[in-house]
């Protein structure tokens, strides 16, 4: 990939997308390839092999105004979801831990009956604290327990402290959509330039 040019800005770079002024990060761990730009427009190109996960990551990108590309090698669903979370976290780890960005974000988002609150900090201490029971339900053929695995792998890969609170909602699909919308916004906030008083 070569060295990172000084023009890449505070987020650092994995590679630069041709024709884009903003830096992006690339991770190629666990046969997952992720490219993400924190200074995007919400465009996404996701091929995880799991339509529900594709949909949820598309919401994350759109609500966070992140440009996100993700390609996964075919595998068992459990491995695919874990790989996606870990690779995305690793791609975000360096830019969100930079002293030049806020490194933390908080957001509330709704999806029909569901309302979720996410607080994220690039603390270097991976931890997920959640009041959401994702142990048994299924949506679109995906066990929601795998989404819990995604969040844990995201936190581990990125070094994030992640608090997930479900304020309201019973429908599993809507609960997951609210969580991923709020997560996208919180990531966007974490990537904003740090103001002097912060």
Outline where the language-model segments fall:
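Polyanion-binding surfaces on beta-sheet-dominated domains and ring/shell assemblies
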Residues: 16-198
């Amino acid at each position: 990939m070569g060295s990172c040019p000084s023009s890449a800005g505070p987020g650092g770079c994995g590679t630069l997308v041709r024709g884009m002024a903003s830096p992006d990060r690339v991770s190629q761990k666990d046969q997952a390839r992720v490219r993400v730009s924190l200074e995007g427009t919400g465009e996404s190109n996701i091929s995880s092999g799991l339509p529900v996960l594709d949909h949820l990551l598309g919401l994350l990108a759109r609500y966070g105004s992140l440009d996100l590309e993700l390609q996964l090698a075919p595998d068992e669903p459990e491995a695919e979801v874990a790989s996606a979370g870990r690779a995305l976290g690793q791609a975000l780890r360096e830019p969100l831990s930079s002293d030049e960005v806020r490194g933390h974000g908080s957001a509330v988002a709704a999806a029909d009956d569901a309302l979720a609150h996410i607080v994220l900090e690039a603390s270097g201490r991976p931890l997920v604290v959640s009041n959401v029971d994702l142990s048994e339900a299924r949506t679109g053929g995906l066990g929601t327990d795998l989404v819990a695995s995604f969040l844990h792998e995201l936190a581990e890969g990125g070094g994030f402290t992640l608090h997930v609170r479900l304020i309201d909602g019973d429908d599993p699909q809507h609960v997951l959509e609210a969580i991923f919308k709020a997560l996208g916004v919180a990531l966007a906030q974490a990537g904003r330039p740090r103001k002097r008083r912060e």
